[in-house]
């Protein structure tokens, strides 16, 4: 039997966290953590897990490991890790590798897994890919793998792939693509150029085709898969369970990290409108988003000088505990904690850091229904999958 370790975080202070918590649009300070959550390691030994999703019919997780390009089934009840064969070859240089995973909304009737990853062409240039394959649990494999889309163009760069993917309420695929770390800020930046896929969210049908309803399908020389643009390197993407809005967490330059509600056809600002500064300076990257009418302002942000919140995977809580109902949880990489955001419509009211004393780079978080727990993937060598429960006493078994 697996030994389950429970870590008490009671009494945790906020010393050293204030810069990471920062201020939001209403300039209200972050709240202090309650420090009474219970943390359990349910699986261990993963190599830089980047994403996980829940199989709805047996409550196992599908987990990606970025650097080694491995896809596995993880059982949170006993800690068993089952690698799956048939995964596409990836390029793991820089920030690349095997990245996100999503399941078809009609799973298991439609047994498709959707994978995002970086891969190279014959010239060694890379880009963000999305592929799908059928999960065969009997053979522990992914079969009938087909590439659905390759972000264009391929480049000799290895950073800012974006790569979060989810199904929207319309049962279409939404995928983030990073700006590949182009730093020629201004109106000609790749994130403002719709002839490429960089700095965007793409919308695709489950078979990879472009929906006729996409906002730019009738415009010449524009990439038809683009749903919205003006993002830097969005590594969190989730659907609000009540409003059906798509929320994104986007990395800023120096600070300037954002929580964004996506709008079809919208310009979300990067880099012509941004709350952050250029690296190593106090010089603004662009105009303030709230001073421009041609961009969509984020619903929450960290201004230059606050320390920022380098965000990763995110989810709205859909579990059974009343205290967390409607809250948004976002992984913080550099700050090394899980951020809890209390959301009222489009207003972010408060922040609470969870598991902030363990030096865990929180890469992804999921909230399965019919349980009070969150599950978190930590980005590290020999990394754990964690179960986090609210408001309970610590224990060991």
Placement of each model-derived feature along the sequence:
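Conserved blade-ending motifs and adjacent loop-strand segments that build the rim/top face
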Residues: 348-369
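Beta-propeller domain segments
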Residues: 76, 96-98, 106-108, 120, ...
């Amino acid at each position: 039997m697996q030994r389950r370790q429970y870590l008490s975080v009671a009494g945790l202070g906020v010393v050293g966290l204030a810069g990471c918590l920062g201020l939001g649009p209403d300039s209200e300070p972050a709240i202090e953590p309650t420090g009474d959550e219970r943390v359990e390691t349910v699986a261990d030994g993963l190599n830089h897990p980047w994403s996980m999703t829940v199989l709805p019919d047996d409550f196992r997780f599908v987990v990606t490991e970025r650097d080694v390009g491995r896809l596995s089934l993880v059982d949170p009840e006993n800690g068993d890790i089952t690698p799956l064969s048939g995964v596409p070859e990836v390029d793991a240089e820089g920030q690349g590798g095997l990245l996100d995973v999503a399941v078809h909304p009609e799973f298991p009737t439609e047994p498709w897994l959707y994978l995002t990853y970086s891969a190279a062409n014959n010239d060694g240039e890379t880009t963000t890919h999305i592929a799908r394959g059928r999960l065969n649990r009997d053979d522990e494999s992914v079969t009938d793998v087909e590439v659905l889309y390759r972000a264009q163009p391929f480049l000799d760069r290895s950073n800012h792939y974006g790569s979060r993917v989810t199904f929207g309420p319309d049962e279409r695929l939404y995928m983030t693509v990073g700006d590949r770390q182009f730093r020629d800020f201004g109106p000609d930046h790749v994130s403002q150029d719709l002839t490429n896929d960089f700095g965007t969210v793409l919308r695709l049908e489950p078979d990879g085709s472009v929906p006729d309803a996409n906002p730019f399908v009738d415009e010449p020389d524009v990439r038809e898969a683009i749903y919205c643009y003006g993002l830097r390197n969005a590594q969190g993407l989730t659907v609000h369970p009540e409003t059906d809005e798509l929320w994104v967490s986007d990395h800023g330059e120096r600070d300037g990290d954002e929580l964004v509600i996506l709008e079809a056809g919208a310009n979300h600002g990067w880099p012509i409108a941004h709350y952050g500064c250029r690296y190593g300076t106090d010089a603004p990257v662009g105009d303030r988003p709230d001073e421009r009418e041609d961009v969509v302002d984020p619903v929450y942000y960290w201004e230059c000088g606050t320390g920022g919140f380098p965000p990763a995977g995110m989810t709205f809580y859909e579990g059974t505990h009343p205290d967390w109902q409607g809250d948004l949880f976002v992984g913080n990489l550099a700050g090394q904690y899980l951020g809890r955001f209390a959301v009222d419509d489009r207003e972010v009211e408060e922040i609470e850091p969870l598991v902030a004393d363990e030096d865990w780079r929180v890469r992804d978080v999921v909230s399965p229904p019919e349980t009070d727990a969150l599950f978190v993937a930590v980005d590290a060598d020999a990394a754990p999958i964690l179960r986090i429960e609210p408001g309970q006493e610590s224990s060991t078994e």
